[in-house]
Amino acid sequence: MSSSPAQRHTRKTQIGFVSSRSGDKSIKVTVPYKSPHPLYHKIVNRQTVLHVHDEKNEAKLGDTVEVMETRPMSRLKRWRIVSIVQRAVTTDAVAISETDVAAQVPTKTTASNTPAPAEQPAPQA
């Protein structure tokens, strides 16, 4: 008995962001969602953390990824990466010396090293 593609169940997909790199080929993806509070009916922000298999080690911290449900890969991993939706914006750290920092930071001026303002004569009426 073979099943046609129309009868086959589709797998669940979720979109979330990479919150942790927990080892080789393993990441944690946080999927945010909103749900109403059962008593007060206020919309509450919640999140689910999924353990995801990253075969190529291509996802970085902060990336937005699409994950799909799959067979169990390990004790906790039941999801795998389908695609990276958006890369995280990263800034490269630049080494600077203390003299560069001192030149850019303004210094405090005190009354002892600033000249006194000149007095203006009062206008005559």
Swiss-Prot record:
Single GO term (MF): structural constituent of ribosome
Gene Ontology CC annotation, any one: cytosolic small ribosomal subunit
Superkingdom: Bacteria
Family (UniProt): Belongs to the universal ribosomal protein uS17 family.
Lineage: Bacteria, Pseudomonadati, Verrucomicrobiota, Opitutia, Opitutales
Species of the source: Opitutus terrae (strain DSM 11246 / JCM 15787 / PB90-1)
Gene: rpsQ
UniProt-annotated stretches for the region Disordered: 1-21, 101-125
Database matches in HAMAP family: Ribosomal_uS17_B (MF_01345_B)
Keywords of this entry: Ribonucleoprotein, Ribosomal protein, RNA-binding, rRNA-binding
GO biological process: translation
Residues forming coiled coils: none
Function noted in UniProt: One of the primary rRNA binding proteins, it binds specifically to the 5'-end of 16S ribosomal RNA.
Protein name (database record): Small ribosomal subunit protein uS17
Subunit structure of this chain's protein: Part of the 30S ribosomal subunit.
PANTHER family, per the entry: 40S RIBOSOMAL PROTEIN S11 FAMILY MEMBER (PTHR10744), SMALL RIBOSOMAL SUBUNIT PROTEIN US17M (PTHR10744:SF1)
Annotated InterPro entries: NA-bd_OB-fold, Ribosomal_uS17, Ribosomal_uS17_bact/chlr
